[in-house]
Amino acid sequence: RAALAESDAEANDLTAECTIHLPEDTAEFAARFTDGKYDSRISFTAKEELTIDVPGEAAGLYVAWYTAPEACVVESLDADGNVIKTESADTDLLNGYYVLPSGCAGVRISGGRAFAISELGVYDAETPPEALCIMSVQKTQPKVMLIVTHTGDEAYYFGSILPFCASEDVAVAFIMARSRTAQQEAIELQYALGSRMQPIFAGFQYF
């Protein structure tokens, strides 16, 4: 726990120093990116883009997607607006952390398809703070899979075995999730237990 605190202390949140540029019809909702509510979001059409002016110390960008992006690109820009790095967002992850190169003055996020973002953060560290709970994609063929119906069921019914699910060879899968917040809570629980593999969310309608 002390090590986690030290890691977070080394990463400074620079989000307040950034300038966010949104399409005109959603510009008034910029505060949704930092309200800590994963169910609030700003949606973009396939033709719209988000740009962020970042300070010189910026080294990492956190994006909490409302749904896993289907075709999004994160571009780092220099002071003249030239692209100096391009990275495709992982289509299987709800939360991403993207390293910004030296000389980065801005970031542009766009997609070949519609997308939505719940939270944004800019930090002065290439390594994501532990509090963000950044995870990796589950293995294609894990040795063990724990399948539960709803988010929250894993703790209620299987709480005693969850500590043993931290291995990368174990996948936790949810048939349905009540909300994006519920998905985030499931991610944070698995992360706290030591897992670095994001749970699988099948996406069936909640009932």
What are the language-model segments listed below?
Residues 61-64:
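Non-catalytic accessory regions used for complex assembly or targeting
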Residues 3-58, 68-86:
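Disordered, acidic Ser/Thr/Pro-rich linker "stalks" and the adjacent N-terminal cap
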Residues 39, 70, 87-88, 92-97, ...:
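Active-site rim/loop-helix segments in enzyme catalytic domains that contact anionic ligands
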